[in-house]
Amino acid sequence: MGEKDIIRDLYEVILDRRQKQPDGSYTAYLFEQGEDKILKKIGEEAAEVLIAAKNGGGAALVGEMADLVYHLLVLLAWHGLAPEDVLAELAARRQKKS
C-alpha cells in the first residue's frame, strides 16, 4: 500500500467496519454511538493538534493530525461522502484561483 492510496485504503476499512460492526472495533463503536460522538472526537482531536503544534510540532503533531484525519474520514462515511468529494472540491477551488 503506497502513501498515495492510504486515505482511500483507510476509508475502505472504515466503510467495512461500519457495515460489519466487528466486536472490539473502535470504528464500529463510533458509528454505534452516532454523529454526536464522532463530532466530539473531532473536536478533541482538533484541540490536540493545536496543543501539539504549540508544543513544537514534530512527531506529536504528525500523530495528532493522523488522528484528526481518521476521525474526519469517519464523519465523511457517516454522511455518505468520500475523500474524493473533498479532493474534488479542493481541485475546483484551485482552478478558480488559477
Swiss-Prot record:
Enzyme Commission numbers on file: 3.6.1.31
A Pfam match: PRA-PH
Pathway: Amino-acid biosynthesis; L-histidine biosynthesis; L-histidine from 5-phospho-alpha-D-ribose 1-diphosphate: step 2/9
GO MF assignments: ATP binding; phosphoribosyl-ATP diphosphatase activity
Top EC class, one word: hydrolase
Catalytic activity: 1-(5-phospho-beta-D-ribosyl)-ATP + H2O = 1-(5-phospho-beta-D-ribosyl)-5'-AMP + diphosphate + H(+)
Keyword annotations: Amino-acid biosynthesis, ATP-binding, Cytoplasm, Histidine biosynthesis, Hydrolase, Nucleotide-binding
InterPro entries: HisE, PRib-ATP_PPHydrolase-like
GO biological process: L-histidine biosynthetic process
Subcellular compartments: Cytoplasm
Family membership noted in the UniProt record: Belongs to the PRA-PH family.
HAMAP family given in the database record: HisE
Protein name: Phosphoribosyl-ATP pyrophosphatase
Species: Pelotomaculum thermopropionicum (strain DSM 13744 / JCM 10971 / SI)
